[in-house]
Amino acid sequence: PHSFKLKGNKKLGGNKNLNYPFFAAKPFIRNRTLQIRNGGNDTRCRFKDPALQTIIQSSGIDIDGQSYQPVHEFINGKYIGVLNVREPNNKHYVYANYGWDEEEIDQFEMNPDSGYVQKCGTDEAFNTWYALSANAADEATYEEIKKLVDIDEYTNYMAMEFYLGGADWPQNNIKGFRRSVDGRFRFVTFDLDGAFGSNDPFNNFMGRQTYTFDPLYGCEVNRITAEIKLVTIFKNMLQNATFKKRVIDVYSLMGGSVFEPT
């Protein structure tokens, strides 16, 4: 079965919201769109991503992620199969979970075609974070960075990604957002189909400070080689002793608590 989206429509009443508690884990959120997903690149079991995200959410750790609900798909009465309903992972995720419209946020993503893409707002705060990170070892500078980034959620997110070892990250599958006025960046977990695809995720990440993005997959045409600033930022921030200790502690928490069988 194919993946598709459902979108709210003002013509059907309301304000584009789909007024129904689709997700038991988040009955309170205001969905304007839903993803009906077939498993993406996980073509065999189809639920690697929702299973991992459910484990993460159930642990109680502070990481933004998509809720999940399996559904049966019928088209004109014909049974198609089992798919999974997901929250969106873009500006509509921010609205559903935080109530901020796209005019109120800065949001970016990493795209395998072209690298960093600004989806909403401006890149001013992100570039300030990037510039400050060069001096992150200094505690005063680190405190300034903490005004731009939710350090706890960011560290949790990074440790989780390292633990799961996705093969298509960080050159892809990264989305960050913040409220434009005095907000702090948070990161949304999504598309963990490639989890466990890397046997050395930390060093693979560190080795992708420069990456060649491919607009036409498999064709040496219009390729873009660029810095992945998120790798540079993380490398720089590890120079801060406080941050480095937190990364080590949270990574240990991943294996010892979040993903520990109970």
Task: Locate the predicted segments by residue.
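Catalytic-core segments of enzymes that bind and process phosphorylated/nucleotide-bearing substrates
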Residues: 1-262
